[in-house]
């Protein structure tokens, strides 16, 4: 049984733990014991994961970013009267370090100079969730960052410390991006009418 793409929050998507994602498959290939442990243990996002989520939200759901995030003022001191007042007004938001404001500006300039800017130039949808009850005997899911309306183009944004061809090639192997790409293509082949051309 195949499900058509669904619109849901990131939290709802990750809450569907009966379905395997590319992340869980990569864990199985790396360490089956860690995979089984993570299935039952409470997940605590690392700082890198939280920053990655912020970057994705900035580029893909900018209005949501404005509602959920804020930047800590430079030379912030939470012990002062002004600092305490600022925390009272912004404590309900996800607070990013002051330098992240400038980082995102530089990232945006780089992004607009890359092929990934197609997400602004072509019709498509962000953060759609795809589910399959039987992907080779596995309940599967995937959530591409962006997919074109004709399903011919899929974009998944990645942050990296080294954007050179050699540096990013190393990241591909280190983080299993090639496995993720294959998983996404297979999921979309099963769940999207136009995905034959994509895969």
Please state what every model-predicted region is.
Residues 190-199:
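Single conserved hydrophobic/aromatic residue that forms the stacking wall/gate
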Residues 168-175:
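Short, contiguous acidic/charged loop-to-helix segments that flank catalytic cores in large enzymes
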Residues 178-187:
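An active-site-proximal "capping" alpha-helix that borders the catalytic cofactor pocket
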Residues 1-142:
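Metal-dependent nuclease catalytic cores that hydrolyze phosphodiester bonds in DNA/RNA
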Residues 59-64, 159-162, 189:
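Hydrophobic/aromatic-lined pockets within catalytic cores
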Residues 144-167:
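Conserved catalytic cores of phosphodiester-cleaving nucleases, focusing on short active-site segments
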Residues 116-120, 148-154, 188-190:
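Secondary-structure boundary elements
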